[in-house]
Protein backbone atom coordinates (compact mmCIF):
# COMPACT_ATOMS: atom_id res chain seq x y z
CA UNK A 1 0.00 0.00 0.00
CA UNK A 2 1.16 3.53 -0.80
CA UNK A 3 -0.20 6.92 0.19
CA UNK A 4 -1.76 8.91 -2.64
CA UNK A 5 -1.31 12.71 -2.58
CA UNK A 6 -3.46 15.27 -4.39
CA UNK A 7 -2.65 18.53 -6.12
CA UNK A 8 -3.83 21.58 -4.12
CA UNK A 9 -6.66 22.44 -6.52
CA UNK A 10 -8.80 23.50 -3.53
CA UNK A 11 -8.10 24.22 0.14
CA UNK A 12 -9.72 20.92 1.08
CA UNK A 13 -7.41 18.96 -1.22
CA UNK A 14 -4.22 20.78 -0.21
CA UNK A 15 -3.13 18.33 2.48
CA UNK A 16 -5.54 15.49 1.71
CA UNK A 17 -4.12 11.99 1.26
CA UNK A 18 -5.68 8.57 0.71
CA UNK A 19 -4.72 4.97 0.12
CA UNK A 20 -3.94 3.91 -3.45
CA UNK A 21 -5.78 0.61 -2.72
CA UNK A 22 -3.07 -1.30 -4.64
CA UNK A 23 -3.60 -4.40 -2.46
CA UNK A 24 -7.35 -4.54 -3.15
CA UNK A 25 -8.13 -7.20 -5.78
CA UNK A 26 -11.92 -6.76 -6.13
CA UNK A 27 -14.58 -4.17 -5.36
CA UNK A 28 -17.45 -6.69 -5.24
CA UNK A 29 -17.91 -8.33 -1.81
CA UNK A 30 -19.13 -11.89 -1.23
CA UNK A 31 -22.93 -11.53 -1.06
CA UNK A 32 -23.49 -14.45 1.33
CA UNK A 33 -21.28 -12.77 3.96
CA UNK A 34 -23.04 -9.37 3.91
CA UNK A 35 -25.56 -8.25 6.52
CA UNK A 36 -27.67 -5.04 6.68
CA UNK A 37 -26.24 -2.33 8.93
CA UNK A 38 -28.80 0.13 10.25
CA UNK A 39 -27.56 3.54 11.36
CA UNK A 40 -28.08 4.34 15.04
CA UNK A 41 -26.66 7.91 15.06
CA UNK A 42 -25.31 7.27 18.57
CA UNK A 43 -28.79 6.69 20.07
CA UNK A 44 -29.95 3.81 22.28
CA UNK A 45 -33.29 1.95 22.22
CA UNK A 46 -34.95 4.93 23.95
CA UNK A 47 -33.72 7.35 21.32
CA UNK A 48 -31.37 9.03 23.80
CA UNK A 49 -27.89 10.12 22.74
CA UNK A 50 -25.32 7.73 24.26
CA UNK A 51 -22.34 8.21 21.90
CA UNK A 52 -21.48 11.71 20.73
CA UNK A 53 -20.26 12.65 17.24
CA UNK A 54 -22.05 9.78 15.44
CA UNK A 55 -24.49 10.31 12.61
CA UNK A 56 -24.87 10.52 8.85
CA UNK A 57 -22.25 9.03 6.58
CA UNK A 58 -22.34 6.78 3.56
CA UNK A 59 -24.47 3.63 3.56
CA UNK A 60 -22.60 0.47 4.53
CA UNK A 61 -23.15 -3.25 4.69
CA UNK A 62 -21.58 -5.29 7.46
CA UNK A 63 -19.06 -7.97 6.43
CA UNK A 64 -19.25 -11.05 8.68
CA UNK A 65 -15.66 -11.65 9.84
CA UNK A 66 -14.35 -14.97 11.18
CA UNK A 67 -12.51 -13.95 14.36
CA UNK A 68 -12.65 -17.49 15.83
CA UNK A 69 -10.55 -19.19 13.11
CA UNK A 70 -11.85 -22.62 14.16
CA UNK A 71 -11.72 -24.49 10.80
CA UNK A 72 -9.07 -26.88 12.10
CA UNK A 73 -7.22 -29.02 9.58
CA UNK A 74 -9.16 -27.71 6.56
CA UNK A 75 -7.01 -25.78 4.05
CA UNK A 76 -8.31 -22.42 2.88
CA UNK A 77 -7.23 -20.52 -0.22
CA UNK A 78 -7.08 -16.70 -0.27
CA UNK A 79 -9.50 -15.71 -3.05
CA UNK A 80 -9.49 -11.90 -2.74
CA UNK A 81 -8.20 -9.00 -0.64
CA UNK A 82 -11.03 -6.51 -0.10
CA UNK A 83 -11.77 -3.10 1.40
CA UNK A 84 -14.02 -3.08 4.48
CA UNK A 85 -15.74 0.23 5.31
CA UNK A 86 -16.34 -0.91 8.90
CA UNK A 87 -12.67 -1.20 9.96
CA UNK A 88 -9.22 0.21 9.25
CA UNK A 89 -7.75 -3.16 8.20
CA UNK A 90 -8.41 -4.85 4.87
CA UNK A 91 -10.14 -8.25 4.80
CA UNK A 92 -9.41 -11.45 2.88
CA UNK A 93 -11.99 -13.85 1.45
CA UNK A 94 -11.04 -17.47 2.17
CA UNK A 95 -12.42 -20.39 0.15
CA UNK A 96 -12.13 -23.55 2.26
CA UNK A 97 -11.76 -27.04 0.80
CA UNK A 98 -15.17 -28.08 2.18
CA UNK A 99 -16.87 -25.32 0.16
CA UNK A 100 -17.38 -22.79 2.96
CA UNK A 101 -16.38 -19.14 2.48
CA UNK A 102 -15.26 -16.84 5.28
CA UNK A 103 -13.73 -13.39 5.68
CA UNK A 104 -10.67 -12.91 7.89
CA UNK A 105 -8.52 -9.89 8.79
CA UNK A 106 -5.89 -9.53 6.04
CA UNK A 107 -2.41 -9.89 7.52
CA UNK A 108 0.59 -8.06 6.07
CA UNK A 109 2.07 -10.18 3.28
CA UNK A 110 -1.05 -12.30 2.74
CA UNK A 111 -1.49 -12.84 -1.02
CA UNK A 112 -4.19 -14.14 -3.34
CA UNK A 113 -3.70 -17.86 -4.00
CA UNK A 114 -1.94 -18.49 -0.69
CA UNK A 115 -3.17 -21.43 1.41
CA UNK A 116 -3.80 -20.94 5.13
CA UNK A 117 -4.56 -23.37 7.97
CA UNK A 118 -5.91 -23.35 11.53
CA UNK A 119 -5.19 -25.70 14.42
CA UNK A 120 -2.24 -27.33 16.18
CA UNK A 121 -0.83 -28.83 12.95
CA UNK A 122 -0.56 -25.44 11.18
CA UNK A 123 2.89 -24.07 10.35
CA UNK A 124 4.16 -20.79 11.78
CA UNK A 125 3.34 -18.80 8.64
CA UNK A 126 1.52 -15.52 8.03
CA UNK A 127 -2.24 -16.00 8.14
CA UNK A 128 -2.25 -19.32 10.01
CA UNK A 129 -4.11 -19.51 13.35
CA UNK A 130 -2.97 -21.56 16.35
CA UNK A 131 -3.39 -21.72 20.11
CA UNK A 132 -0.88 -19.53 21.97
CA UNK A 133 0.79 -22.59 23.55
CA UNK A 134 1.74 -23.79 20.04
CA UNK A 135 3.28 -20.45 18.96
CA UNK A 136 7.05 -20.03 19.56
CA UNK A 137 8.37 -17.23 21.78
CA UNK A 138 9.22 -14.09 19.78
CA UNK A 139 6.54 -14.64 17.12
CA UNK A 140 4.57 -11.60 15.94
CA UNK A 141 0.80 -12.21 16.18
CA UNK A 142 -2.60 -10.48 15.87
CA UNK A 143 -6.34 -11.18 16.36
CA UNK A 144 -5.79 -12.57 19.89
CA UNK A 145 -8.55 -14.20 21.93
CA UNK A 146 -9.05 -13.25 25.60
CA UNK A 147 -11.29 -16.25 26.32
CA UNK A 148 -10.89 -19.61 24.53
CA UNK A 149 -13.42 -19.97 21.73
CA UNK A 150 -14.80 -16.42 22.02
CA UNK A 151 -12.97 -15.10 18.97
CA UNK A 152 -10.16 -12.58 18.60
CA UNK A 153 -10.64 -9.31 20.48
CA UNK A 154 -7.14 -7.81 20.70
CA UNK A 155 -4.86 -6.44 17.94
CA UNK A 156 -7.24 -6.17 14.99
CA UNK A 157 -6.65 -2.60 13.71
CA UNK A 158 -4.56 -1.76 10.64
CA UNK A 159 -0.81 -2.08 11.18
CA UNK A 160 -1.02 -3.42 14.74
CA UNK A 161 0.83 -6.44 16.11
CA UNK A 162 1.72 -8.14 19.39
CA UNK A 163 4.59 -10.42 20.37
CA UNK A 164 4.82 -13.63 22.39
CA UNK A 165 7.31 -12.96 25.21
CA UNK A 166 7.19 -16.17 27.23
CA UNK A 167 5.15 -19.01 28.70
CA UNK A 168 4.32 -19.52 32.39
CA UNK A 169 2.19 -22.55 33.26
CA UNK A 170 -1.25 -22.22 31.69
CA UNK A 171 -0.60 -18.60 30.65
CA UNK A 172 1.39 -16.95 27.85
CA UNK A 173 2.96 -13.50 28.17
CA UNK A 174 2.02 -11.15 25.33
CA UNK A 175 3.42 -7.66 24.65
CA UNK A 176 0.68 -5.55 23.06
CA UNK A 177 1.07 -2.62 20.68
CA UNK A 178 0.66 -0.15 23.58
CA UNK A 179 3.65 -1.65 25.41
CA UNK A 180 1.44 -3.41 27.96
CA UNK A 181 2.55 -6.93 28.89
CA UNK A 182 -0.39 -9.20 29.64
CA UNK A 183 -0.99 -12.82 30.64
CA UNK A 184 -3.46 -14.67 28.39
CA UNK A 185 -4.61 -18.30 28.68
CA UNK A 186 -2.43 -20.60 26.56
CA UNK A 187 -5.53 -22.22 24.99
CA UNK A 188 -6.60 -18.90 23.43
CA UNK A 189 -5.99 -18.56 19.69
CA UNK A 190 -4.07 -15.96 17.70
CA UNK A 191 -3.13 -15.46 14.06
CA UNK A 192 0.48 -15.26 12.87
CA UNK A 193 1.76 -11.95 11.48
CA UNK A 194 1.05 -8.23 11.60
CA UNK A 195 -2.27 -6.73 10.49
CA UNK A 196 -1.94 -5.29 6.97
CA UNK A 197 -2.73 -1.79 5.64
CA UNK A 198 -0.07 -0.45 8.03
CA UNK A 199 0.11 3.00 6.43
CA UNK A 200 -3.50 3.74 7.36
CA UNK A 201 -2.33 6.04 10.19
CA UNK A 202 -0.58 8.32 7.66
CA UNK A 203 -3.82 9.23 5.85
CA UNK A 204 -4.81 12.90 6.23
CA UNK A 205 -8.58 13.49 6.11
CA UNK A 206 -8.00 16.93 4.56
CA UNK A 207 -11.44 18.46 5.03
CA UNK A 208 -14.45 18.34 7.34
CA UNK A 209 -16.76 16.92 4.67
CA UNK A 210 -14.71 13.75 4.37
CA UNK A 211 -15.24 13.09 8.08
CA UNK A 212 -18.98 13.48 7.50
CA UNK A 213 -18.83 10.85 4.73
CA UNK A 214 -17.46 8.48 7.39
CA UNK A 215 -20.32 9.20 9.78
CA UNK A 216 -18.38 11.49 12.13
CA UNK A 217 -20.14 14.63 13.34
CA UNK A 218 -18.35 17.76 14.62
CA UNK A 219 -16.85 18.06 18.12
CA UNK A 220 -18.06 21.29 19.75
CA UNK A 221 -15.91 22.93 22.47
CA UNK A 222 -17.52 23.05 25.90
CA UNK A 223 -16.49 26.70 26.40
CA UNK A 224 -18.82 27.83 23.59
CA UNK A 225 -21.84 25.99 25.05
CA UNK A 226 -24.38 27.19 27.60
CA UNK A 227 -23.90 26.37 31.31
CA UNK A 228 -26.73 23.80 31.20
CA UNK A 229 -24.93 21.89 28.40
CA UNK A 230 -21.35 21.78 29.72
CA UNK A 231 -19.39 22.67 32.90
CA UNK A 232 -17.16 24.99 30.81
CA UNK A 233 -20.15 26.83 29.32
CA UNK A 234 -21.49 30.31 29.98
CA UNK A 235 -19.76 33.55 30.94
CA UNK A 236 -19.31 36.77 29.00
CA UNK A 237 -17.22 36.49 25.85
CA UNK A 238 -14.21 34.16 25.89
CA UNK A 239 -14.45 33.40 29.59
CA UNK A 240 -12.12 30.95 31.39
CA UNK A 241 -13.63 27.63 32.43
CA UNK A 242 -13.85 28.68 36.09
CA UNK A 243 -12.74 25.29 37.43
CA UNK A 244 -9.59 23.87 39.02
CA UNK A 245 -9.21 21.41 36.15
CA UNK A 246 -10.96 20.77 32.83
CA UNK A 247 -14.17 18.76 33.13
CA UNK A 248 -16.02 16.32 30.89
CA UNK A 249 -19.58 17.18 29.76
CA UNK A 250 -20.79 15.06 32.72
CA UNK A 251 -18.77 16.94 35.36
CA UNK A 252 -15.90 14.46 35.75
CA UNK A 253 -12.25 15.67 35.71
CA UNK A 254 -10.55 15.07 32.37
CA UNK A 255 -7.18 15.52 30.60
CA UNK A 256 -5.05 13.16 32.69
CA UNK A 257 -7.67 11.95 35.18
CA UNK A 258 -7.56 8.15 35.60
CA UNK A 259 -10.86 6.53 34.58
CA UNK A 260 -9.95 2.85 34.94
CA UNK A 261 -11.97 1.09 37.63
CA UNK A 262 -10.01 0.46 40.84
CA UNK A 263 -9.53 -3.21 41.75
CA UNK A 264 -10.52 -4.27 38.24
CA UNK A 265 -10.73 -8.06 38.01
CA UNK A 266 -8.32 -8.13 35.03
CA UNK A 267 -5.57 -6.23 36.90
CA UNK A 268 -4.02 -9.55 37.96
CA UNK A 269 -3.34 -10.42 34.31
CA UNK A 270 -1.43 -7.19 33.56
CA UNK A 271 2.28 -7.72 34.20
CA UNK A 272 3.42 -4.29 32.97
CA UNK A 273 1.29 -1.24 32.29
CA UNK A 274 1.17 0.41 28.87
CA UNK A 275 3.64 3.14 27.94
CA UNK A 276 2.58 6.69 28.82
CA UNK A 277 1.77 8.83 25.80
Curated annotation (Swiss-Prot):
Gene Ontology BP annotations: cytoplasmic translation
Pfam families: Ribosomal_L2 (PF00181), Ribosomal_L2_C (PF03947)
Membrane-spanning intervals of the chain: none
SMART domains: Ribosomal_L2 (SM01383), Ribosomal_L2_C (SM01382)
Keyword Cytoplasm (UniProt): no
Keyword Plastid recorded: no
Region of interest: Disordered: 24-55, 221-277
Any one GO molecular function term: structural constituent of ribosome
Keywords carried by this UniProt record: Ribonucleoprotein, Ribosomal protein, RNA-binding, rRNA-binding
InterPro entries per UniProt: NA-bd_OB-fold, Rib_uL2_dom2, Ribosomal_uL2, Ribosomal_uL2_bac/org-type, Ribosomal_uL2_C, Ribosomal_uL2_CS, Ribosomal_uL2_dom3, Ribosomal_uL2_RNA-bd_dom
Gene Ontology CC: large ribosomal subunit
Assembly: Part of the 50S ribosomal subunit. Forms a bridge to the 30S subunit in the 70S ribosome.
Function: One of the primary rRNA binding proteins. Required for association of the 30S and 50S subunits to form the 70S ribosome, for tRNA binding and peptide bond formation. It has been suggested to have peptidyltransferase activity; this is somewhat controversial. Makes several contacts with the 16S rRNA in the 70S ribosome.
Family the UniProt entry places it in: Belongs to the universal ribosomal protein uL2 family.
The protein's name in its UniProt record: Large ribosomal subunit protein uL2
Organism: Listeria monocytogenes serovar 1/2a (strain ATCC BAA-679 / EGD-e)
Amino acid sequence: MAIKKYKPTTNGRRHMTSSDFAEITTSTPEKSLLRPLKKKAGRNNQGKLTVRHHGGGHKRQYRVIDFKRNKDGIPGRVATIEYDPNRSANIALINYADGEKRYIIAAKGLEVGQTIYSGAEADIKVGNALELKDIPVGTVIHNIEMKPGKGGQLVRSAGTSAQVLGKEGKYVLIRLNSGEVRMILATCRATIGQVGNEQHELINIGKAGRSRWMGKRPTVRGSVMNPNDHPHGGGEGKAPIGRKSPMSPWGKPTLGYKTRKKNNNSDKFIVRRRKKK
